[in-house]
Amino acid sequence: STYKIYDALFGLEEGVITPQDSFIAWNGENYPFEAWNADQTLQSAMASSVNWYFQSVDEQLGASDVYSYIQEIGYGNENMSGDFSSYWMESSLEISPIEQVELLTKLQNNSFGFAPENINAVKDAIRLSSSDTGTLYGKTGTGRVNGQDVNGWFIGYIETADNTYFFATNIGADSDATGGNATEITMSILSDMNIWK
C-alpha cells in the first residue's frame, strides 16, 4: 500500500484525478472494510488505504502509462508482470527500505520534476500530524498472504524547522506483521532519538 503514494502522483500527472477534483464514486461492491464502502477522494482513499480507488486510477491510466511512470521514477524492481489489478499487492512489484527512502527524498524535494501542485496534493494526502516538533508525513502498508499479515510497512518523513528526517520500517513475520505494528516501532524509535515528541 505504500506504492499508493506514487500511484496517486501518476494519476495526478495524467489528469485522471486533480488536486481540486479527486472524487471517484463507489461502485456499490461490498468490501471487507466499512471505510471502503463509500465514495472517495484522494484524502480519504489514502487515509483508509482504499485499494479499489487506486485500482480505478490505474484502469484509467492504462498499464503502459503506469509502467512508464514506474520506470521514470525508478520504483523498486520495476516489475509489473503480476496481474494488473494487484501487481503492487504482495505480487511482482517489490521495493527495499533503502529504495523507499530514496523515493521519498525525491518526492519531498520534487526532483521528479512533476507539477508542484500534484506533489503538494500527495503530500497533503499523506500528512498525518503536526506538533511543536514539526510535521509528520507517512503511509502504512500491510501485505497479506493466505490470510496472514506477513509484511508490514511504515514509510514517511518528518519536516522540522531545520531538517527533514526520512524513514522506512519494514517487518516480516509469519503473522501480525502489520503497518500498525511498523508504525508503533517507528514512532518509538523517532521518540527515542528526540526527532518526534
What residue spans do the PLM features occupy?
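Active-site SXXK
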Residues: S1-F23, A45, F167
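Soluble non-cytosolic domains of exported or imported proteins
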Residues: S1-T2, T18, W36-Q40, S44, ...
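Extracytoplasmic
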Residues: T2-Y3, P19, N37-Q40, W52, ...
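Active-site-proximal loop and beta-strand segments within enzyme catalytic domains
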Residues: E13-Q40
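Surface-exposed patches in mature extracellular/periplasmic domains of secreted proteins
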Residues: P19-I24, D58, E78-F84, S111-I119
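Solvent-exposed loop/turn segments at secondary-structure junctions
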Residues: N30-Y31, W52-Y53, Y75-N77, S85-M89, ...
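Mid-domain, small-residue-enriched loop/turn segments at the edges of structured enzyme/sensor domains
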Residues: E34, T41-L42, S56-L104
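Structured C-terminal helix/loop/strand segments within mature extracytoplasmic catalytic/sensor domains
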Residues: E59-G62, T105-G134, T140-K197
